[in-house]
A protein has these predicted regions:
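Functionally constrained cores in energy, signaling, and assembly domains
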Residues: 2, 6-9, 23, 30, ...
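Short, well-ordered beta-strand segments in beta-rich or mixed alpha/beta enzyme
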Residues: 3-10, 39-74
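A short, structured loop/turn motif at beta-sheet edges
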Residues: 13-15, 32, 61-63, 102
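Short amphipathic alpha-helical segments
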Residues: 15-41, 74, 78-82
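Short acidic, gly/pro-rich beta-turn/loop elements at beta-sheet edges
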Residues: 17-19, 66-68, 105
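Glycine-rich beta-strand-turn "strand-cap" elements at beta-sheet edges
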Residues: 37-55, 78-105
Length: 105
């Protein structure tokens, strides 16, 4: 069962530039490292999340793969170094999982 994992980070709106500059470094890290899952980044315009949020999402084959990715992020030094710089701008983090529905016959 395919699963979409979303990591939603609400950041301090007065620090949007600094937060996004660090997020660009995360995107560069994904491109540089083939072991990193490549996520799609979204910022709400009109949604259930505030406009000062960044959503990273990726589709996984199953929920186990999604959980393994969270473990990977937590254990990767480059990721942790960047996250430690970004964490001061983050007000809230949520992680959501969605089952991908496929009604093809």
């Amino acid at each position: 069962m395919a699963v979409i994992m979303r990591i939603i980070q609400q950041f301090d709106p007065s620090c949007e530039k600094e937060f996004m500059d660090l997020e660009k470094q995360f995107a560069a890290l994904e491109k540089k490292r083939p072991d990193f899952p490549t996520g799609k980044r979204l910022q709400p315009i009109s949604a259930g999340e505030p406009v000062n949020a960044l959503i990273w999402q990726h589709e996984f084959e199953n929920i186990e793969s999604a959980y393994m990715t969270l473990d990977f992020f937590g254990g990767d030094r480059e990721h942790e170094d960047l996250f430690s710089k970004q964490a001061g701008y983050i007000k809230q983090v949520k992680i959501e999982f969605f089952r991908v529905l496929d009604f093809k016959e």
